[in-house]
A protein has these predicted regions:
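Short, Lys/Arg-enriched N-terminal segments with co-localized hydrophobic residues
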Residues: 33-37, 44-55
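Acidic/aromatic-lined carbohydrate-recognition and catalytic surfaces
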Residues: 56-292
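Acidic, His- and aromatic-enriched active-site or binding-groove loops in soluble protein domains
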Residues: 111-135, 288-313, 377-387, 421-433
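Active-site neighborhood of glycoside hydrolase catalytic domains
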Residues: 255-265, 335-421
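Substrate-binding/active-site clefts of carbohydrate-active enzymes
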Residues: 272-337, 342-345, 364-371, 375-379
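Substrate-binding cleft/loops of secretory-pathway carbohydrate-active enzymes
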Residues: 282-294, 407-426, 438
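Residue-level detector of conserved catalytic or cofactor/ligand-binding positions
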Residues: 441-454
């Protein structure tokens, strides 16, 4: 359960100043699935007589799209998504928090994705494709969707989902074929989508086609011409694999159309979408493949250092995540252009944006890529406020929420304060630490800008 804004009040009361009236309401209890969540009336902002914006309390629920009910192995952008929006609106909730909508790869985590820009093909609603005449009921019944309807079987899903999506693509491509199948006439909104997203879509579709051709191996294991992005080799591959490349564009097109419909429905109901992005990209990703100078590279063009966390009382060896580290000096030279693109794209998908591992923008743990543990790492300085100033100059005021959990240096807390981004509180953390952690985690004494979780 997510609470945003001012702390809860124990009694319903009215506060009045010279111009404005603010009403606070108690939360009541609403039983959902297993256990209880707290539901209350949402009031967003008001003005005091001094003219300052006063952030009011609002609340919502964290529900990953993958956890929505459905008959085809995983939650998606279908009927259940709209019904969940209806539930939130009826319960007085104004925020639906979801996990990143990025494609999942090995490990099935949206925080280790093959693309920082693409959407998860698993979330495309198959029943919508059936209504569009791209699939039949027999197509859906022919596949296995897992034995347990309450759990996602990603191994089964990987086989069945893409098999069905390829059938839908074949039907769509056939529908778009011109006379004798020599020319394809795609819908106007498809052309608009590919044009609006060409800065990442072309590379992503080519990358995925190459992964399929290489039996889904990490790109660092591809033959040198493809690994090193030889222009002639890539052009020849693209010409020979036009249909496969088109499939990956088609899936992203359908993902975008369906998700934007869900988001528009939520916004009409007064519900904002709170999404998220990880700070780092995956080593096995199109971003790493095309990024080049965006990352710390050695003389051979391989990643010089990778991300992780230092040893602590949870792990004597620390955490070796393996994500490539950004070359922040290069990003600065470009005016943080890649980050501007990334955040602009994310804000086209979400209304509010949670950035994971916020502390990494202040200081981050850098580990030699050859290390087998995180012990050999060292702290390095991140871009700090320079990055957020560049983002705000390009995009305006940023609706960002910072994931600032865990032990933080004073400099991290200063960066959070300077950015004015809301941080996070988790009520459960109050019961596992010392007195200071207890006080920091209590949601009823939260600072007005905190987002609190129970």
């Amino acid at each position: 359960m997510l609470f945003a804004g001012a702390p809860a009040h124990t009694a319903c009361k009215r506060q009045t100043n010279t111009k404005y009236t603010t009403v606070y309401h108690d939360f009541c209890l609403w039983k959902i699935v297993c256990g209880y969540v707290m539901i209350g009336t949402s009031i967003k902002t008001d003005k005091t007589k001094r003219g300052r914006e006063h952030i009011m309390r609002e609340s919502g629920i964290l529900m990953p799209v993958s956890s929505l009910p459905g008959p085809y192995g995983i939650g998606c952008f279908g009927k259940a998504a709209l019904e969940f929006v209806d539930f939130l609106a009826e319960a007085g909730q104004t925020i639906w928090q979801i996990l990143p909508l990025s494609p999942t790869g090995y490990g099935d985590s949206p925080y280790q994705s093959c693309s920082a820009f693409a959407g998860n093909p698993y979330f495309v609603d198959l029943e919508t494709l059936e209504k569009e005449g791209l699939l039949t009921a027999a197509d859906l019944k022919a596949e296995s969707w897992g034995k347990d309807p309450l759990e996602v079987d990603y191994g089964t899903l990987y086989v069945s989902r893409f098999a069905v999506l390829r059938k839908a693509y074949a039907a769509w491509r056939s529908r778009c074929a011109g006379l004798h199948g020599c020319t394809y006439y795609y819908p106007d909104d498809y052309y608009a989508f590919t044009l609006a997203n060409e800065d990442w879509l072309e590379d992503y579709a080519l990358y995925m086609a190459l992964k399929v051709a290489n039996k889904m191996k990490n790109w660092v294991e591809w033959n040198a011409p493809y690994r090193r992005r030889d222009k002639a080799a890539l052009a020849a591959f693209a010409a020979a694999n036009e249909e496969e490349i088109g499939f990956w564009k088609f899936v992203q097109y359908k993902f975008s159309v369906q998700w934007q419909a869900v988001k528009a429905y939520a916004n009409e109901k007064g519900v904002q979408i709170l999404g998220g992005i990880p700070i780092y990209v995956s080593a096995d990703s199109v971003d790493a493949w095309v990024g080049g100078k965006l990352f710390e590279l050695d003389a051979d063009g391989r990643f010089a250092r990778v991300a992780g966390c230092p040893p602590d009382y949870f792990s004597a060896d620390g955490q070796l995540w393996g994500n490539p580290l950004y070359d922040w000096a290069y990003h600065k030279k470009t005016g943080y252009a890649w980050w501007v693109r990334r955040v602009r794209h994310a804000l086209g998908i979400y209304d509010l944006l949670r950035i994971d591992h916020f502390r990494g923008f202040d200081t981050y743990w850098a580990i030699p890529a050859t290390s087998t543990t995180a012990r050999t790492g060292k702290w390095e300085n991140g871009p700090g406020m320079e990055l957020f100033d560049a983002l705000e100059a390009a995009l305006g005021k940023l609706p960002i929420i910072a994931e600032d959990l865990g032990e933080l240096f004073p400099s991290v807390r200063k960066l959070l304060a300077d950015s004015t981004f809301p941080g996070m509180k988790v009520l459960q953390f109050a019961f596992g630490g010392g007195d200071n952690e207890y006080l920091l985690s209590l949601i009823h004494i939260s600072e007005p800008t905190r987002r609190s979780y129970i």
